[in-house]
């Protein structure tokens, strides 16, 4: 189900590397509205995954562990650690403070100018084949430069001050809230316009003792119309929806 959620495609049944699905709608959006932001898209999750081998009824784990597919053969793994998400959004700084961000952007630009100048001087002494390789490298550097310019234009955005997280919070509820805060800031700063957030990998069997449900989530979904199991599954659904209010 997870593999089809945003693709609308029945994935190929395989436990091997020959996976095949479809491009997900978030990545279609990223190809359009993601071109003008530093990050075309952001893939987030709240549970560690396995990306190899079989996970369910002859299907590869790749189908269970993400809902984002860049192409029919390219699943995009999600990031679960809020600290790494913060660093991807704001670099290796410790805060969203605008003064700190502006200083870091100037440092990045100075370094980029040095790299471009050095590479252009080197080009005069290279043969044709190496110059082509250098040209490809410079194209990549200029893409970085473009993204830095986009970031600089956004650095004046009024953002809530958020310090770099230490890592994954101890509870599911805190994890949801922190990831939601990061998504909100990413949207406010226009660092990306496309985000997927997967609460649990398919068949993940998370339990919800905080709301009095010790049963594994996936197991409850096979309730066989048992009223007690259906009631506990409903509690989980309500809990998930209630947490959206924080976002």
List PLM regions with ranges.
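Ligand-binding pockets and gating/stacking loops
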Residues: 1-247
């Amino acid at each position: 189900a997870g593999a089809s959620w945003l693709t609308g495609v029945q994935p190929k049944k395989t436990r091997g590397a020959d996976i095949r699905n479809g491009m997900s709608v978030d990545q279609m959006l990223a190809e359009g509205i993601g071109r003008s932001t530093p990050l075309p898209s952001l893939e987030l999750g709240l549970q560690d995954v396995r990306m190899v081998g079989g996970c369910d009824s002859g299907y590869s784990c790749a189908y269970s562990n993400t809902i984002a597919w860049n192409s029919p053969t390219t699943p995009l793994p999600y990031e679960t650690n809020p600290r790494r998400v913060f660093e991807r959004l704001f670099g290796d700084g410790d805060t969203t403070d605008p003064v700190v961000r502006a200083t870091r952007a100037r440092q990045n630009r100075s370094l980029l100018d040095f790299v471009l100048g050095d590479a252009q001087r080197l080009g005069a002494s290279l043969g044709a084949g190496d110059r082509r390789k250098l040209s490809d490298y410079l194209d990549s550097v200029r893409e970085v430069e473009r993204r830095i310019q986009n970031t600089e234009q956004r650095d004046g955005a009024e953002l809530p001050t958020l310090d770099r997280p230490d890592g994954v919070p101890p509870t599911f509820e805190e994890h949801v809230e922190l990831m939601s805060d990061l998504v909100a800031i990413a949207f406010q700063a226009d660092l990306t316009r496309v985000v997927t957030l997967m609460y649990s990998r398919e068949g993940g069997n998370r339990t919800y003792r905080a709301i009095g449900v010790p049963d594994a989530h996936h197991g409850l979904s096979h309730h066989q119309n048992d009223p007690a199991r259906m009631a506990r599954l409903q509690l989980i659904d309500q809990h998930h929806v209630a947490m959206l209010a924080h976002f």
